[in-house]
Amino acid sequence: LSLTSFDKEFELNGLAAESWLQSDDGLTWTFNLRDDLKWSDGETLKASDYIFALQRAATTGYDFGWYWSFAGGLKNWGPVTDGSMDVDQLGIKAVDDKTIEVTTETVKPYLPSVVSLWYPVPEHAWKKHGDEYAANVETMVASGPFMLESWEKSTNKMVLVKNPNYNAP
């Protein structure tokens, strides 16, 4: 469940984020998450799940890294991804369970559209199953309107069902 999304008229709307504000200097954005966001396993979706996702992307050779450097302009993305700076110095933080703060290197007035491609990773599932958390039906956890019911890997057939814990727009 991304923070924002575009509707059929190409208007930007909140998805996981119910609101966002840009600081006076233009370098810091605060995103406020909707109440009662849940993973498909019933666990609460937290701001820290978004932070965990980008921290993993920054430290695991993520192929889409240029997006967060160029379009997103995240503070310290380059030094963190090249290993010369600790991932905790990346310009993202969970202020609390419902608040994400993003700091950029330069003013990015379009950042709310950039975060339409920022998806969380269920840190609780990853801690329990490692990278296998998304490798099979029994351990896969989703945040969107659907979840995996079955997966025939030999034929690449997946059956999706409604996620009963999905309550975003």
Regions found by a protein language model. Give the residues of each.
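Surface-exposed binding/hinge segments that line
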Residues: 32, 49-51, 58-125, 152
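Short basic (Lys/Arg) and small-residue
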Residues: 37
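N-terminal lobe/hinge region of extracytoplasmic solute-binding protein
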Residues: 1-24, 55, 141
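Extracytoplasmic
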Residues: 15-17, 24-28, 87, 95-99, ...
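Structural recognition of the beta-strand scaffold that forms the well-ordered cores
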Residues: 29-32, 159-161
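Gly/Pro-rich hinge or "lid" segments in bacterial periplasmic/extracellular proteins
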Residues: 104-169
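Extracytoplasmic/secreted envelope proteins and their assembly/folding machinery
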Residues: 17, 47, 51-55, 89, ...
